[in-house]
Amino acid sequence: MSCSKSMVLGYWDIRGLAHAIRMLLEFTDTSYEEKQYTCGEAPDYDRSQWLDVKFKLDLDFPNLPYLMDGKNKITQSNAILRYIARKHNMCGDTEEEKIRVDIMENQIMDFRMQLVRLCYNSNHESLKPQYLEQLPAQLKQFSLFLGKFTWFAGEKLTFVDFLTYDVLDQNRMFEPKCLDEFPNLKAFMCRFEALEKIAAFLQSDRCFKMPINNKMAKWGNKSIC
């Protein structure tokens, strides 16, 4: 790794909002270490590992994930991604690329949160059919936006590809056939997974494929599907 002083990424010991960040750190050869917090078991789901230090880290808006890079202390997962991406010119070059990045950053997070809300809802099983019914229409929008481009900003890889891969992969795990109607999305997933540093990370013990969510979730809360 290239940097002499490691960044510190703080998050729960799950995939969650940190997967795209971890992949971007790995892809950019950024030296980093993780501070992982563990949520307790049912029924209390004790979060004291994090809550005991939450307001002692000099964070402006204390939350997980956080990234510490020397004097720079950042929360909000997309702000962290942008911070890393700016260091490596991965936010888009042209105005068109930057616009597409801005759109995708927000659109994919809206999409992510729909699945998150479902997974943590106590009525998960009864609400699941409704989610699956509307899923193809949402995926079609992403397919049309990608079109014939290689990446979601165009022909240049940007940080939103890391976000989008993560969210599409979670949906693919939730409904394995959901991408079958969208060859360009499937091709995007294959291209991303074939990036040398991404392929190595996904096969490493540093990668959290599961659990996606924390222990109180109704889906994605265990180490295997």
UniProtKB/Swiss-Prot annotation:
Glutathione binds at Y11, W12, W50, L51, D52, V53, K54, N63, L64, Q76, S77. One of its GO terms (molecular function) is identical protein binding. Keywords: Cytoplasm, Phosphoprotein, Transferase. Substrate binds at Y120. The lineage of its organism: Eukaryota, Metazoa, Chordata, Craniata, Vertebrata. The N-terminus is blocked. It comes from Rattus norvegicus (Rat). Expressed in testis and brain. Very low expression in liver, kidney, heart and lung. SUPFAM superfamilies: GST C-terminal domain-like (SSF47616), Thioredoxin-like (SSF52833). Coiled coil: none annotated. This is Glutathione S-transferase Mu 5.
